[in-house]
Design a protein with these regions (language model features):
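Long beta-strand-rich cores associated with HINT superfamily self-processing modules
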Residues: 160, 168-173, 177, 181, ...
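Short, compositionally biased
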Residues: 223-232
């Protein structure tokens, strides 16, 4: 029995760390979350998501978040003559931990996508214990036009990579900020240094191809300075 309790305790602690990181990620992207949601204690996590025998229940680990006013402003295209009141390119996000511990196939992904689409979620993040099958990944690609779906492994969320002392602060630029940057330095976007969309930081921020991120570093000699990268 002790061995079983110890296994449950380790799994619960791992899931709690992933739960905290995914909340920090969603908050850092600009969604509204209460401080107590982001900084939930391990005891509160156990009370909310563990069964009577101490085992964690991934099926209860889910939440949604709405974009903040600043996020809506950043993701709203500038008005044009043909579209004087453009809609923002963001909306409510749905996050869910997949209860399946085996292979994540088409049926699991279709169910998740249908839930997001039916409930009008603009984006969805599925956190899984194991990697997706190639067929499940194809479902994500097909649905990207109307619901942006992302997947993260639990093990990749045990530590928030942006909290590492060697990782500089990354800030997504709005369309207007990107255009102003290119105009100021008389550059084409293809002349900017690049960051791959599969880069861990790009995935953390949910960067899309064509977006520009500002990287703020501090140097003992140069002080605080910024560089820019285009997501490709």
């Amino acid at each position: 029995m002790e061995g079983s309790d110890n296994i449950h305790s380790k799994e619960t602690t791992r899931l709690w760390r992933a739960w905290r990181t995914i909340h920090e990620m969603v908050s850092d992207r600009g969604y509204e979350l209460a401080e107590e949601e982001i900084k939930m204690s391990l005891d509160d996590f156990r009370a909310k998501f563990c069964n009577g025998d101490g085992s964690p229940d991934r099926g209860r680990m889910q939440f949604s978040a709405r974009p903040s006013e600043s996020m809506i402003k950043k993701f709203t295209p500038p008005p044009t003559a043909s579209n004087p009141d453009p809609a923002p390119d963001c909306g409510t996000i749905w996050v869910e931990f997949c209860p399946e511990k085996g292979s994540i196939g088409i049926n699991v992904m279709k169910k998740f996508v249908e839930h997001c689409a039916t409930n009008n979620f603009k984006a969805g993040i599925l956190v899984t214990a194991v990697a997706l099958s190639s067929q499940a990944r194809k479902v994500m690609t097909v649905t990207s036009q109307y619901t942006l779906i992302e997947c993260f492994l639990e093990e990749d969320l045990l530590v928030n990579i942006t909290h590492h002392e060697l990782v500089p602060k990354h800030v997504l630029l709005s369309r207007d900020e990107k255009n102003a940057l290119l105009k100021r330095y008389r550059l084409k976007e293809t002349q900017l240094p690049r960051i791959l969309s599969k880069d861990p930081i790009a995935r953390y921020l949910g960067l899309k191809r064509g977006q520009v991120v500002k990287i703020i570093r501090t140097s003992e000699t140069a002080g605080r300075y910024a560089s820019y990268r285009l997501c490709v």
